[in-house]
Amino acid sequence: MSEKNMEKAGVVKADELDEMIDETTGGASTVNTVGIHTTYLISKGLQNCPLKPTTILPILPRK
């Protein structure tokens, strides 16, 4: 995957992500880092995703 495509897809390099997390959290504890990593990647992915979360909701099974 080329660097440009990765940027478009919202893929962030681990070291860049660590820097962003440090800026956001003031250096979170390592225990929490994985959660923040995944949350960050998911939110980053959703921002770049052409589908908005509202378009996904109707597909979910109703109770």
From Swiss-Prot:
* A single GO cellular-component term on record: extracellular region
Q: Which residues form the propeptide?
A: 1-28
UniProt PTM comment: Maturation of FlvA2 peptides involves the enzymatic conversion of Thr, and Ser into dehydrated AA and the formation of thioether bonds with cysteines. Modifications are processed by the flavecin synthetase FlvM2. This is followed by membrane translocation and cleavage of the modified precursor.
Q: Which UniProt keywords apply?
A: Secreted, Thioether bond
Q: Which domain of life is it from?
A: Bacteria
**Keyword Secreted annotated:** yes
Q: Where in the cell is it found?
A: Secreted
Q: Which cysteines are joined by disulfide bonds?
A: none
**Lanthionine (Ser-Cys) cross-link, chain position(s):** 43-49
Q: Does the keyword Disulfide bond apply?
A: no
- 2,3-didehydrobutyrine is found on 30, 33, 38-39, 54-55
Chain's role: Lanthionine-containing peptide that does probably not show antibacterial activity, since its analog [+3]Flvbeta.a does not show antibacterial activity against M.luteus. Also does not show antibiotic activity when tested with [Del2]Flvalpha.a, an analog of Flvalpha.a, which is encoded by the same operon than Flvbeta.a. The bactericidal activity of lantibiotics is based on depolarization of energized bacterial cytoplasmic membranes, initiated by the formation of aqueous transmembrane pores.
The name this protein carries in UniProt is Lantipeptide Flvbeta.a
Source taxonomy lineage? Bacteria, Bacillati, Bacillota, Clostridia, Eubacteriales
